[in-house]
Each structure stands twice: as structure tokens, then as C-alpha cells.
Amino acid sequence: MIGHLAAMLPPPSTNSPELTVSELSAALKRTLEDRFGIVRLRGEISNYRGPHSSGHAYFCLKDQNARIDAVIWKTTFMRLKVKPEEGLEVIATGKITTYAGKSSYQIVVEAIEPAGLGALMALFEARRRQLASEGLFDEERKRALPFLPAVIGVITSPTGAVIRDILHRITERFPRPVLLWPVRVQGETAAAEVSAAIEGFNALPVTGQGPLHRPDLLIVARGGGSLEDLWGFNEENVVRAAAASSIPLIAAIGHETDWTLIDYAADLRAPTPTGAAEKAVPVRADLLTSLNDLQRRHAGAAYRLLERRRSDLRALARALPQADSLLATPRQRLDRTATRLATACLRAQDQRGLVLGRLAHRLSRQAPHASLARLGQKLEAFGRGLGRACEIAQERRRQSLLHLGIRLTQNFTQGIRVERERVHGRRQKLASLDNRLRQAMSLTLSQRQARLANLAQLTRSLSYHAVLARGFALVRDETGQPLRRAADIIENHVLTLEFSDGCRQAVAGALVATDPPVDPKPTRKPVQKSSSPKPSSRKPKKSQQEDLF
């Protein structure tokens, strides 16, 4: 390569023009790019501080004896499967080029892969320690799985044996609805699809608020494979999505010996996808057996408790005194109180009857019939007077117009124009007076009619017919006088019963004894004797026993 560069330079003894720095830099750039093209470098990443604000990444690749600058452009950095990390030994694939600003050469990296299994394990441990320091793997964050989820969400490949094993195991143990979110479980886009699926399930509405029900449990599953095949489940975005999931999550990645970072962040790790299905739902037959056993034990316990309560009740019943001896004194006290209560009720009824009689007499003197009749007569007389006044006024206007016409005829030649204007004005005034008169008549009639309607409504509300309309009846004797008490009715006399829609005649029968209403305020408090009387040996009458019970 040095000989090739020397051949491009002019001999010192010639008169060839000199090269500029830019020309020399461009020549070196072309020589390096044409000579090496795409290369694969193995080295350790150093001086890496994360992507620049522009999105590009700058670092160095070094070994024991040398180092080279490296750059990853933004578009390439976004699609890298393995991101650069400080101290990670990698194999970088890219093109050798120069940077004219520093007169140095560098590699433009197109792809990065860990340099062997040891590098991947070192990256795995470093990432695990970083995420653990943030508390993503703490046991306090993990939630208990639902005992019997209504809907189970599965995130895996739709074509592999994993989904078939999960569906078969769930159907065999306890059939539950399963929502599958198909994703790639290997490759460059696997991590992004798995994290998007976890976030998508968490974004679904709760049960009953949309066409898709939000799962009660998530299963992230994949079959076995090498560390490189399972690396997508070690990506930081997948681990953070699993830790942030509000739905309990089971991770079933690979076989029992395979561990990924999502296993640490999940609420439960299953050794295999089949084991995840077994953790998700119980065995229906075992539940039925346990339920039947609990039912038998509950029935036996209830029977034993009932028998024990029956024995206790029998023992307590034998210790109780006889009911007749306990109720003898209260029954006698009740008989005496009932007799006093009947007397007090009759006395209160008489007092209320006197009060109602006085109120009825006052109401009959203030009945609105007379005032309504007087108001009607006044209204009728006012209407007749108003009509006569209108006729007289119209007649006077006609006479005035007649005189005006005669005068207009006599003085037609001198002032016909003036008289026409005067006649026109009088007609307008007459029309105005007539209109005002009619309005006054209409207003007065409306006011009188409204007052008459109010008085009629008052008459109806104060009349006893409103009481009859509510289901009561007015009882009159043969002379037409109202009867207020049953004791005033003579047996076998003809009575007139007035209802709201008419009258009926009836013949009075015998007086029937009924329970008088209880007066809440007796006029006299019963006097309690100091010594209780002896129980009477005489049995109460049949009618009294019926009234009491």
C-alpha cells in the first residue's frame, strides 16, 4: 500500500505541481476504501457514552496493541440487534474510511455481534445487574396470579408447537377463552413485537367495555433454543414492558435450564410453555372433587350443629315456667284496661260530636249560596244597565250625525271640505269610544265571571258533597234530619242514605257493637291500685274475648 501511494506522488526531481492537503486526504480515502472495502473487526468497545444527540454513536474498538475509531450512523444504530456497551467484546462489520478533519482512519460499522458466548453472558450479567438495581426484579413488585382467569392472553408465534401445547393443556385442565397476540419470537424485530404485545394487552378495555375483553393473565412463551435465539427476551424494552404490566404475567421461555431477563421481571416463571398453562388454570376435576368434599363436610357440620341446638333448646324449654302462670296477671290487667278504654272512647266520641255539631252550625250560617246569588243578581243588573247605556250612547251619536248631515246639506257650497274632515274625525272618535266601551264591557264581564267561578269552587269545596264523593254517605231519618250517632237510629225505621250520585232508602236493623277507635289522649288517666286484685274465677263473656283477641 505504501508503494502504491509512493507511485502516485511525483518524483522530487520533476516539475509536477504540488498536492494540497485535501487532495492527499481524498487520495488516501479512495485507496483505503478500494483496498479493504467491507471488513470484520474483533475488539473491545471503549469510550462509549451512549448515542449522540444527533442519533449517531461514536466509540473505539481496541485490542491489546491497537485501537481504531468507530462510528455508527443513526439509521444503522436504530436497527441494530445488539447495541454497543462499554467493555463488550464484539465483532463489528463495516467499511474502512478516513476522516479528513483529523487525518485519521475509522470504521463505519454496519452490524455488531457479540464475540462468542462469553461476551453474551457478560452482557447478560451486566444488564441483569443494572435492571436489578432499578428494582425491576424485586419480589415486592410481583403480583399473585388469579385463581381462575376469565380470559388468558398468550404472546407467542402463531405457527409453532408452543401455542398448540398451551391450548391443549388449558382445554384439558379447565377450558378458558384464550386471546393470541401473534409475534416473532426470534430475529431483529422480536423484542419490539413482544414489548408492543404486552403493552397492547394492557391497553385493552376492561371486561364489558369493548369487543375484546382485557385478559386477566398473560403468558409470554417460546420454545427452546440457543442463547442467541433467546436473546430477544433479554432486551431492555421487553423486560421493562413485563415489569410495567398491570396484568399478572407468566414467562415460559425455552426449557427449564434456560434463563432470560424476562423471567426475572415476570410475576411467575414457568420452566416450559406447558408448565405455564398448568400454572394458569387449575384442574377442573380436582376442583369438583374438592368442592364435593367440602359440601359433604359442610352438610355434616350443619347437621351436628342443628342437633346440638335442638338439645340445648329442649333443655332450656324444660327450665322455663308454664305459659299460663306467666300470662295470668297480664291478661287480667289487659281486661281491665280494655274496659276502661271502651268507656274513655265513648266519652271522647261524644265530645268530638259536640265540637263537630257546633262547627256544622257555624258553617251553615256562613254558606256561600246567598252571597253567590247576590253577586249573580248584581252582575245581571250591571249587564242590563251596560246594554242600555250602549244603546243610548249609540242613539245619541246617530242623532248628532243626523244633525250634522242636515247642517252639511244646508252649508254644502260654503264648507263641504271642512265638514267632511270634521265628520271623519267624529267617526274615528265614535269608533274609538265604541271600541273602548266594548273592551270595558268584556273586561268587567271576565272579572265577574272569574269571581263567580271562584265562589262556585269555594262552594263545592265547603259542601258536604265532596265528602260523599270520597266514599262516605249521609244518613237522614224520616223527617230528613241528619243522624250523627248510631244510638239515635230507631230500629225498623226507614232511613235515607245520600251518596254522591243519588239516594237510597234502607231499614234500620239492630245496633251492632264494634271496637271504638282508640283515643290517643284519654281524658282521665286510670288509677293504679296498690294491691293487685285476685284473679276472678268468673270467665269473661264471649263478646269480650272476641274484642280482645
UniProtKB/Swiss-Prot annotation:
Gene name as annotated: xseA
Known catalytic reactions: Exonucleolytic cleavage in either 5'- to 3'- or 3'- to 5'-direction to yield nucleoside 5'-phosphates
Subunit note: Heterooligomer composed of large and small subunits.
Role of this protein: Bidirectionally degrades single-stranded DNA into large acid-insoluble oligonucleotides, which are then degraded further into small acid-soluble oligonucleotides.
Main location: cytoplasm
InterPro entries, per database record: Exonuc_VII_L, Exonuc_VII_lsu_C, OB-fold_nuc-bd_dom
Protein family (similarity comment): Belongs to the XseA family.
GO terms for cellular component: cytoplasm; exodeoxyribonuclease VII complex
GO molecular function: exodeoxyribonuclease VII activity; nucleic acid binding
Pfam families membership: Exonuc_VII_L, tRNA_anti_2
Keyword Glycosyltransferase found: no
Keywords: Cytoplasm, Exonuclease, Hydrolase, Nuclease
Location of the region described as Disordered in the Swiss-Prot/TrEMBL record: 511-549
GO process annotations (BP): DNA catabolic process
Enzyme Commission number(s): 3.1.11.6
Source organism per UniProt: Beijerinckia indica subsp. indica (strain ATCC 9039 / DSM 1715 / NCIMB 8712)
Protein name (Swiss-Prot/TrEMBL): Exodeoxyribonuclease 7 large subunit
